[in-house]
Amino acid sequence: MSTVIRRSLAARQLWSWNGFCQWITSTENRLYIGWFGVLMIPTLLAAAFCFVIAFIAAPPVDVDGIREPVIGSLIGGNNLISAAVVPTSAAIGLHFYPIWEAASLDEWLYNGGPYQLIVLHFLIGVWCYLGRQWELSYRLGMRPWIAVAFSAPAAAATAVLLVYPIGQGSFSEGLPLGIAGTFYFMLAFQAEHNILMHPASWLGVAGVFGGALLASLHGSLVISSLIRETSEEESQNAGYRFGQEEVTYNFLAGHYAFLGRLGFPGLGLRNSRSVHFWMAALPTVGIWAAAIGIGIMAFNLNGLNFNQSILDSQGRFIPTYADLLNRANLGIQVMHAPNAHHFPLLLAAQP
């Protein structure tokens, strides 16, 4: 009798586990969960809840570790533009700083513990979302290029939130989680590393702008060459049926005939796959390059930067816009310096 009961319990447990696995990996669900989603959902929820609470009500954070806390919350007097989740204090450095490592909750908040909690959970969730894209593509028999394209923004987020703080030795150097904080990070990064004069930045700008140009160009050509399936009194959009096998626009009329006649005939592509490939490849490679540039700068490898002034054959200085940029960097460095003293050090040391 006991043997029969044990077998029935084992079969029930096996059935429940198999049912759970089938539900997790089922492509018939309204939202695909997947095994990566099992980790993605709780981590992103934790990051989102902590971000909202910290953005609204976090106390001041001693981000520079010099007992001069910075207020970043809405309750502290900021608006939606200036508010941000302030990075973890420089006094913590790169140490893992969960709540139980602090002596009290007030100390954890004062040292910027929520920033580390948000960033680490968010990055885990982002990379799990990438894995979820690959997993769903695999189960549907699709190729994995959707996940490859998403790896660009995932790499960019990892670069500014994790790689750069690791290279600089402190989470206090990470990107503040806010609108004004983002621009603050950009200015400070430019002042310290002159990223605008680095080839990786040029590739990033070219890729993002090139992808935006192709997207607007292709979208406008598609809208302009829709195949009418309705009368003149009805909208052309009403002629589309979800899942229809017929094409909705004339690709050759838009790209080859129209675009080819506006410029060089070679600009008019005849293959829609080539257009969509470049629309995906340009921004993806560009953002990859930008993320690589931030990773290089994180460890102060500035050898590819154009920081030197141009001299003629007689050694005389030739002013360029690069020199203006270098001077601007020096000014931003002075403004960015924490607790800056504008007196000479020897004079300040006099009794």
Swiss-Prot record:
GO BP annotations listed: photosynthetic electron transport in photosystem II; response to herbicide
User: Catalysed reaction(s)?
Assistant: 2 a plastoquinone + 4 hnu + 2 H2O = 2 a plastoquinol + O2
Q: Which domain of life is it from?
A: Bacteria
Q: Please tell me whether the keyword Magnesium is annotated for this protein.
A: yes
Binding residues annotated for pheophytin a, in chain numbering: Y129
Mode of membrane association? Multi-pass membrane protein
Family to which the UniProt record says this protein belongs? Belongs to the reaction center PufL/M/PsbA/D family.
Q: Other comments?
A: Cyanobacteria usually contain more than 2 copies of the psbA gene.
Name of this chain's protein: Photosystem II protein D1 1
Species whose genome carries this gene: Synechococcus sp. (strain JA-2-3B'a(2-13))
